[in-house]
Amino acid sequence: MLVNGVELRDDVFNVEPKKHILWDVVRWQLAKRRQGTHSTKTRAEVNCSKKKIMPQKGTGNARHGARSANIFVGGGVVHGPTPRDYEYKLSKKYRKIALAMALSTKAKNNSVYVLESLLSSLGKPKTKVAFELLKEKGISDKKVLVVTKDQNDIVSKSFKNIPNTKVLPVVGLNVYDILWADALLIEQGALEKIYERVNL
C-alpha cells in the first residue's frame, strides 16, 4: 500500500477495521489504567458503638439497632464501592489484530507520514526544529503521534512542549493513542519494528 510516497505492508497498514475489536481493546486499555482504590466502610467497619441506641419498645420512635446502621449520618455504606482490580485478559493475537486495524485506519486516511530520521542529527532537543517539521507536513495544528524506533530523549524533549503531540517508541505503540491522533509521524527505522510487533 502506497501512503504519502512510501510503500507500506498490506497485512499491517491495509487491514479492514472492525469497530467492535477496536472498542474491545480501547476498553481493555482504559480498564488496565484504573487504580481501583475506591473504598467505603460498611456498618461493621465504621468507628462507633454497636450498642442498641434505644429500647425496642416504649419510646414511640421507630425501632433501631446500632448507630452504625446506614440510615444514620456517619453510619456504614450499603453496597458501596470496595477496592478492586479492573484488569482483564485479551489474547495477544486479538491485540495484534486491533493494532493493525488502528494503523490501517490512519493509512486509509493518508494520515501516516514516514521520515528517514526524526531529529536524530540534533545534538540537543530543539522544539523549533520539531515544530517546523510538523509545519512542513501540514500537521502542526493536528493531534500528532510521533513513533520512534527506540526511546529517544532528544526527540521526546523536542516535541514535549508542542500541544497535542505525543512521542512513543514502537514498544509503547497502542490502539488508544493511535486512534487519539489525527496523524502518525513514523521514523523509517521504526517500520521494521512495527512489522515485527504486529507479525500476524
From Swiss-Prot:
Gene Ontology cellular-component terms for this entry are: ribonucleoprotein complex; ribosome
The UniProt keyword set, sorted, is: Ribonucleoprotein, Ribosomal protein, RNA-binding, rRNA-binding
InterPro entries noted in UniProt: Ribosomal_uL4 (IPR002136), Ribosomal_uL4-like (IPR013005), Ribosomal_uL4_dom_sf (IPR023574)
Keyword field contains Ribonucleoprotein: yes
UniProt xrefs under SUPFAM superfamilies? Ribosomal protein L4 (SSF52166)
Q: Which domain of life is it from?
A: Bacteria
What Gene3D superfamilies is this protein classified in?
3.40.1370.10
State its role: One of the primary rRNA binding proteins, this protein initially binds near the 5'-end of the 23S rRNA. It is important during the early stages of 50S assembly. It makes multiple contacts with different domains of the 23S rRNA in the assembled 50S subunit and ribosome. Forms part of the polypeptide exit tunnel.
* Protein name in the entry: Large ribosomal subunit protein uL4
The species this protein belongs to is Hydrogenobaculum sp. (strain Y04AAS1)
Q: Identify the taxonomic lineage of the organism of origin.
A: Bacteria, Pseudomonadati, Aquificota, Aquificia, Aquificales
Q: Which gene encodes it?
A: rplD
